[in-house]
């Protein structure tokens, strides 16, 4: 179906410049897994202006957000490791390779006084945005506390966020590029219900003799999916709870996963 029908959106943020789809044609593939090695990703952006191209350099911070309508979340935070611009027919294609450095964003310092009435969800969104345009994949604290006298945010952003999250009786999880705030009493990470009506496209049993993954899943893009996410899957050849081992988000708005049954 058309972009207008689905409301597909992509944001690529480089420094303070925001490049958006569908205004620009953008392709991406971002990878994630349970290994400690930083995740990698690639973005192709078509027909950038000469001025914009001149402003993009190696080592620049880059964030990729994707989703539908108002439900947009980060699928990659990192730095640019390679840039190449080529001509393909009448188009100019800028190919950008990225490496994940979410923790560097969260180690930035903040010194800001929020006014009376600020609440937990707003503080989380605003501080992640201040960190470099980050967005929470899940922002569902146990208690959305209102601070009637305001809130003083001073220190490393990750330390201030930890305080806000703990005061709300919640927990926050960072898996690669995914940042989620969830109720403390939920499982290791919030589960996602998945069947044909909610975005499941296919399930394939894997025959790996020495691997931890048992099944491969293809689904509509869901920016909240990350390593260790729990999925409640209902399909003909898989019915039950699985844990995400690795996967990728793609610009055809699919998420491909390898999972293991629990």
Segments from the language model and where they lie:
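Short beta-strand-centered interaction patches in the first periplasmic/extracellular domains
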Residues: 1-2, 6, 93-103, 131, ...
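Juxtamembrane "anchor/assembly" segments of surface/extracellular structural proteins
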Residues: 1-55, 99-103, 187-262
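Surface-exposed cap/loop segments at beta↔alpha junctions
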Residues: 48-132
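Extracytoplasmic/secreted envelope proteins and their assembly/folding machinery
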Residues: 77, 121-125, 158-162, 214, ...
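Short glycine/serine/proline-enriched coil/turn segments at secondary-structure junctions
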Residues: 71-72, 86-90, 173, 225, ...
């Amino acid at each position: 179906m058309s972009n207008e029908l689905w409301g597909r959106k992509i944001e690529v943020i480089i420094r303070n410049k925001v490049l958006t789809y569908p205004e620009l044609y953008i392709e991406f593939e971002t990878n994630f897994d349970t290994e400690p090695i930083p995740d990698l990703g690639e973005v192709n952006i078509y027909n950038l202006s000469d001025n914009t191209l001149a402003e993009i350099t190696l080592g620049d911070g880059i964030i990729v957000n994707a989703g539908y309508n108002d439900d947009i979340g980060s699928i990659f935070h990192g730095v640019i490791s390679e840039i190449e611009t080529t001509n393909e027919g009448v188009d100019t294609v800028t190919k950008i390779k990225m490496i994940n450095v979410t923790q560097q964003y969260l180690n930035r310092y903040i010194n800001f006084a929020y006014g009376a009435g600020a609440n937990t969800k707003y503080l989380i969104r605003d501080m992640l945005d201040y960190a470099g345009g980050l967005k929470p994949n899940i922002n569902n604290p146990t208690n959305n506390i209102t601070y009637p006298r305001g809130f003083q945010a001073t220190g490393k952003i990750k330390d201030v966020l930890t305080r806000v999250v703990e005061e709300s009786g919640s927990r926050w999880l960072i898996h690669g590029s995914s940042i989620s705030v969830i109720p403390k009493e939920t499982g290791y990470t919030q589960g996602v219900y998945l069947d044909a009506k909610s975005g499941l496209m296919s399930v394939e049993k894997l025959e790996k003799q020495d691997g931890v993954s048992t099944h491969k899943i293809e689904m509509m893009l869901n920016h909240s999916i990350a390593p260790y996410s729990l999925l409640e899957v209902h399909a003909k050849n898989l019915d039950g709870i699985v844990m995400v081992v690795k996967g990728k988000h793609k610009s055809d708005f699919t998420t491909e996963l390898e999972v293991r049954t629990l």
